[in-house]
Amino acid sequence: MEIAPGIHRIEGDLGERYVCQYLLAGEERTLLVDTGLRDMPEQVIAPYLATLGRSLADLDDVLISHADVDHCGGNRALRAAAPDARLLCGEADRAWIESNDLMLAENYLWYEPYGCGPSPDDVDFLARELGGDAPVDVGLTGGETLRLSSDWRVEVLALPGHTPGHVGLWDPRSRAAVIIDAALADGVCDRAGNRLIPPRYYSAAGYEATIRRLGALDPAVLLTAHYDVMEREAARAFLDRSLAFVHAVRDATDANVQAGTTALWPLTQAVDAAVGPFSAFTHELAASVRSHLARV
């Protein structure tokens, strides 16, 4: 679906919810944002490109927004189908994105010593859907400009918080912000609108600064991975909810620490009761809680 001139949203199934990639098709270069799960390049992205008379081999640049399985699991398959495309990502996420083992250990399994973490079935899913190692060509820090046409350039946005090196795009031509998971309101929902997964952020300060930066941009269109397309007023409300959630987690963390709960998993469960409850991946809230403990 074309959202703005040259900007297309590609939607694929992710269990009870969906995940989106974005295609920016210029006259000179074509840019894909994210590769999805392991098989999504061939099963989801390629069929959409075919409707435009294009193929994966026509891609010039592939920007990985951040290190999560549903955003970079298709990297190896994409590399095989588009060997000439440049693979770009935020430099701070590069090590995770390039190494499945490192991603699994440091992004998904670090919870285990605290008594929580993904189930064995979820670990199997993650290991399978990460799709195999793939090298990144260019690490980004934000502020870079990508030229798509003689009159169309987009800016890389550094959007840390959800992950250290999360990046997005700002298109001044349409005032569209491609933010993927840089802000997550008060939770990720299923297709029916039921909250499932808590917003995870590794840096509360970084995540809050990112939300405020996006608000200051005042985008006409806000484009995420797991939510509907939002225009100006809806985008503002979404960012407000994202900020309010950070403050709610902070306040619940502080209150429970002051009451004597300091171990990470019991503390996370108490915070979940205050701001949730969330029915899936509740352990990911531990990352957000831990990021607030640094200031307690």
Residue ranges and their predicted role:
Residues 44-45, 74, 234-238:
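Residues at alpha-helix caps and immediate loop-helix transition turns in enzyme cores, especially N-
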